[in-house]
Regions:
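Long, compositionally biased charged/polar accessory segments in the mid-to-C-terminal portions
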Residues: 36-211
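Short, well-ordered amphipathic alpha-helices
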Residues: 1-2, 28
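A short alpha->loop->secondary-structure connector
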Residues: 3-16
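Oxidoreductase and adenylate-handling cofactor-binding alpha/beta cores
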Residues: 33
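Active-site adenylate/phosphate-handling loop in enzymes that bind or generate adenylated species
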Residues: 16-17, 110
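Short, charged, surface-exposed secondary-structure boundary motifs
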Residues: 20-30
Protein backbone atom coordinates (compact mmCIF):
# COMPACT_ATOMS: atom_id res chain seq x y z
CA UNK A 1 0.00 0.00 0.00
CA UNK A 2 2.75 2.44 0.93
CA UNK A 3 4.77 1.58 -2.18
CA UNK A 4 1.77 2.51 -4.32
CA UNK A 5 0.27 5.44 -2.45
CA UNK A 6 3.10 6.75 -0.28
CA UNK A 7 3.06 7.43 3.45
CA UNK A 8 0.02 9.05 5.06
CA UNK A 9 -0.12 10.10 8.70
CA UNK A 10 -3.52 8.48 9.11
CA UNK A 11 -2.58 5.27 7.30
CA UNK A 12 -2.19 2.50 9.88
CA UNK A 13 -1.11 -0.88 8.47
CA UNK A 14 -1.93 -4.19 10.19
CA UNK A 15 -1.11 -7.71 8.99
CA UNK A 16 -1.49 -11.18 10.48
CA UNK A 17 0.67 -14.07 11.62
CA UNK A 18 -0.55 -16.48 8.96
CA UNK A 19 -0.50 -20.29 9.07
CA UNK A 20 -1.26 -20.55 5.36
CA UNK A 21 -4.42 -20.64 3.24
CA UNK A 22 -6.38 -23.67 2.08
CA UNK A 23 -7.19 -24.16 -1.61
CA UNK A 24 -10.83 -23.04 -2.19
CA UNK A 25 -11.67 -26.05 -4.37
CA UNK A 26 -10.81 -28.41 -1.50
CA UNK A 27 -13.29 -26.54 0.68
CA UNK A 28 -15.95 -26.90 -2.01
CA UNK A 29 -15.24 -30.64 -2.09
CA UNK A 30 -15.61 -30.78 1.68
CA UNK A 31 -18.92 -28.90 1.68
CA UNK A 32 -20.33 -31.43 -0.79
CA UNK A 33 -19.99 -34.02 1.99
CA UNK A 34 -22.32 -32.05 4.27
CA UNK A 35 -25.87 -33.39 4.43
CA UNK A 36 -28.33 -30.62 3.49
CA UNK A 37 -27.94 -27.08 2.19
CA UNK A 38 -25.28 -25.16 4.11
CA UNK A 39 -26.65 -21.98 5.68
CA UNK A 40 -23.80 -20.75 7.86
CA UNK A 41 -20.11 -21.49 8.46
CA UNK A 42 -18.15 -20.38 11.52
CA UNK A 43 -14.44 -21.17 11.80
CA UNK A 44 -14.22 -19.53 15.21
CA UNK A 45 -17.22 -20.86 17.07
CA UNK A 46 -17.09 -20.73 20.84
CA UNK A 47 -16.31 -24.04 22.48
CA UNK A 48 -18.55 -25.41 25.22
CA UNK A 49 -15.41 -26.31 27.16
CA UNK A 50 -13.79 -23.42 28.99
CA UNK A 51 -10.17 -24.32 28.23
CA UNK A 52 -10.75 -25.52 24.68
CA UNK A 53 -9.89 -23.74 21.44
CA UNK A 54 -12.29 -22.52 18.76
CA UNK A 55 -14.85 -24.86 17.22
CA UNK A 56 -15.59 -25.36 13.52
CA UNK A 57 -19.38 -25.02 13.14
CA UNK A 58 -21.52 -25.62 10.04
CA UNK A 59 -25.26 -24.98 10.09
CA UNK A 60 -27.29 -26.76 7.40
CA UNK A 61 -30.93 -27.63 6.75
CA UNK A 62 -30.37 -30.92 8.56
CA UNK A 63 -28.82 -29.56 11.74
CA UNK A 64 -25.56 -28.26 13.18
CA UNK A 65 -22.14 -29.87 12.84
CA UNK A 66 -19.82 -28.74 15.64
CA UNK A 67 -16.30 -30.15 15.91
CA UNK A 68 -12.94 -29.11 17.28
CA UNK A 69 -10.16 -28.34 14.83
CA UNK A 70 -8.58 -31.69 15.77
CA UNK A 71 -11.80 -33.62 15.07
CA UNK A 72 -12.94 -32.02 11.80
CA UNK A 73 -11.36 -33.59 8.70
CA UNK A 74 -11.08 -30.29 6.81
CA UNK A 75 -9.36 -28.32 9.57
CA UNK A 76 -7.19 -31.31 10.48
CA UNK A 77 -6.13 -31.68 6.83
CA UNK A 78 -5.29 -27.97 6.84
CA UNK A 79 -3.15 -28.29 9.97
CA UNK A 80 -1.30 -31.23 8.42
CA UNK A 81 -0.42 -29.22 5.26
CA UNK A 82 -2.51 -31.40 2.95
CA UNK A 83 -4.79 -28.73 1.46
CA UNK A 84 -2.67 -25.56 1.60
CA UNK A 85 -1.93 -23.41 -1.43
CA UNK A 86 1.47 -24.08 -2.95
CA UNK A 87 2.35 -20.39 -2.72
CA UNK A 88 2.20 -20.64 1.08
CA UNK A 89 5.32 -22.81 1.11
CA UNK A 90 7.46 -20.06 -0.43
CA UNK A 91 5.94 -17.11 1.45
CA UNK A 92 8.68 -14.72 2.62
CA UNK A 93 6.33 -12.85 4.97
CA UNK A 94 6.14 -15.89 7.23
CA UNK A 95 9.64 -15.20 8.48
CA UNK A 96 10.72 -11.99 10.24
CA UNK A 97 9.85 -9.66 7.35
CA UNK A 98 6.76 -7.73 8.41
CA UNK A 99 6.31 -4.30 6.86
CA UNK A 100 3.16 -3.44 8.80
CA UNK A 101 2.95 -1.23 11.87
CA UNK A 102 1.43 -4.03 13.96
CA UNK A 103 1.08 -7.79 13.38
CA UNK A 104 -1.71 -9.76 15.07
CA UNK A 105 -2.38 -13.46 15.58
CA UNK A 106 -3.81 -16.13 17.88
CA UNK A 107 -1.52 -17.03 20.78
CA UNK A 108 -1.05 -20.80 20.64
CA UNK A 109 -0.51 -21.47 24.36
CA UNK A 110 -3.55 -20.36 26.43
CA UNK A 111 -2.17 -22.08 29.54
CA UNK A 112 1.02 -20.04 29.36
CA UNK A 113 -1.04 -16.87 28.98
CA UNK A 114 -2.99 -17.78 32.13
CA UNK A 115 0.27 -18.27 34.02
CA UNK A 116 1.26 -14.72 33.05
CA UNK A 117 -2.05 -13.26 34.29
CA UNK A 118 -3.45 -12.79 30.79
CA UNK A 119 -6.81 -14.20 31.82
CA UNK A 120 -8.79 -14.41 28.60
CA UNK A 121 -10.21 -17.49 26.88
CA UNK A 122 -8.58 -16.83 23.50
CA UNK A 123 -5.36 -14.77 23.93
CA UNK A 124 -3.74 -12.97 20.99
CA UNK A 125 -0.17 -12.17 20.07
CA UNK A 126 0.74 -8.61 19.08
CA UNK A 127 4.01 -7.61 17.43
CA UNK A 128 4.75 -3.87 17.28
CA UNK A 129 6.98 -3.30 14.25
CA UNK A 130 7.37 0.46 13.74
CA UNK A 131 7.56 3.70 15.69
CA UNK A 132 4.07 4.56 14.48
CA UNK A 133 2.84 1.16 15.66
CA UNK A 134 4.36 1.86 19.08
CA UNK A 135 2.41 5.11 19.36
CA UNK A 136 -0.84 3.36 18.47
CA UNK A 137 -0.16 0.52 20.89
CA UNK A 138 0.72 2.90 23.73
CA UNK A 139 -2.70 4.50 23.32
CA UNK A 140 -4.59 1.22 23.83
CA UNK A 141 -2.40 -0.96 26.04
CA UNK A 142 -4.04 0.18 29.27
CA UNK A 143 -7.25 -1.49 28.06
CA UNK A 144 -5.53 -4.86 27.51
CA UNK A 145 -4.10 -7.70 29.59
CA UNK A 146 -0.46 -7.70 28.48
CA UNK A 147 2.56 -9.91 29.06
CA UNK A 148 5.85 -9.80 27.15
CA UNK A 149 6.90 -12.91 25.24
CA UNK A 150 10.37 -13.85 26.39
CA UNK A 151 10.82 -17.53 25.49
CA UNK A 152 12.68 -18.42 22.31
CA UNK A 153 10.31 -21.24 21.33
CA UNK A 154 7.31 -18.90 21.35
CA UNK A 155 9.07 -16.31 19.21
CA UNK A 156 10.41 -18.94 16.79
CA UNK A 157 6.92 -20.39 16.34
CA UNK A 158 5.71 -17.18 14.70
CA UNK A 159 8.84 -16.28 12.72
CA UNK A 160 9.93 -19.23 10.61
CA UNK A 161 10.22 -20.39 7.04
CA UNK A 162 7.25 -22.22 5.56
CA UNK A 163 9.66 -24.37 3.59
CA UNK A 164 11.01 -26.05 6.73
CA UNK A 165 10.30 -29.75 6.38
CA UNK A 166 8.12 -31.11 9.14
CA UNK A 167 7.24 -27.78 10.73
CA UNK A 168 3.58 -27.49 11.78
CA UNK A 169 1.44 -26.53 8.85
CA UNK A 170 4.25 -26.38 6.31
CA UNK A 171 5.08 -29.94 5.28
CA UNK A 172 5.33 -29.80 1.49
CA UNK A 173 6.02 -33.55 1.23
CA UNK A 174 2.69 -34.33 2.88
CA UNK A 175 0.89 -31.95 0.52
CA UNK A 176 2.45 -33.47 -2.59
CA UNK A 177 1.48 -36.97 -1.49
CA UNK A 178 -2.09 -35.81 -0.83
CA UNK A 179 -2.31 -34.23 -4.29
CA UNK A 180 -1.45 -37.55 -5.94
CA UNK A 181 -3.98 -39.40 -3.79
CA UNK A 182 -6.61 -36.75 -4.56
CA UNK A 183 -6.20 -37.41 -8.28
CA UNK A 184 -6.73 -41.14 -7.71
CA UNK A 185 -9.54 -41.20 -5.16
CA UNK A 186 -11.05 -37.75 -4.73
CA UNK A 187 -11.21 -35.57 -1.65
CA UNK A 188 -12.83 -37.73 1.02
CA UNK A 189 -10.86 -40.92 0.51
CA UNK A 190 -7.58 -39.05 0.00
CA UNK A 191 -8.08 -37.18 3.29
CA UNK A 192 -8.84 -40.35 5.24
CA UNK A 193 -5.91 -42.21 3.69
CA UNK A 194 -3.50 -39.42 4.63
CA UNK A 195 -4.85 -38.55 8.08
CA UNK A 196 -5.78 -42.00 9.35
CA UNK A 197 -3.61 -44.49 7.46
CA UNK A 198 -2.39 -46.08 10.69
CA UNK A 199 -5.96 -46.64 11.87
CA UNK A 200 -6.96 -48.00 8.45
CA UNK A 201 -4.09 -50.49 8.50
CA UNK A 202 -5.06 -51.59 11.98
CA UNK A 203 -8.70 -52.16 10.99
CA UNK A 204 -7.62 -54.09 7.90
CA UNK A 205 -5.55 -56.42 10.10
CA UNK A 206 -8.54 -56.99 12.37
CA UNK A 207 -10.75 -57.71 9.37
CA UNK A 208 -8.27 -60.25 7.96
CA UNK A 209 -7.97 -61.89 11.37
CA UNK A 210 -11.75 -62.31 11.58
CA UNK A 211 -12.02 -63.98 8.15
Amino acid sequence: IRNKYGFYKKLFVVDLFCHGTAEPFYFRDYLELIDGKVRKIDFRGQSKHERSNFQFVITSDNGILEESFEENIFTKAYAESLIMKKSCFSCKLSENIHVSDITLGDFEWPDRAQERNVRVLHPSIISVNTEYGTKIFDNIKNNLYISDIVTEDEVAFYYRSHSEKGAWGYNIAEKEKFEEDYKKWGFKEAVYRNLFQHEINYLEKIYKYMQ
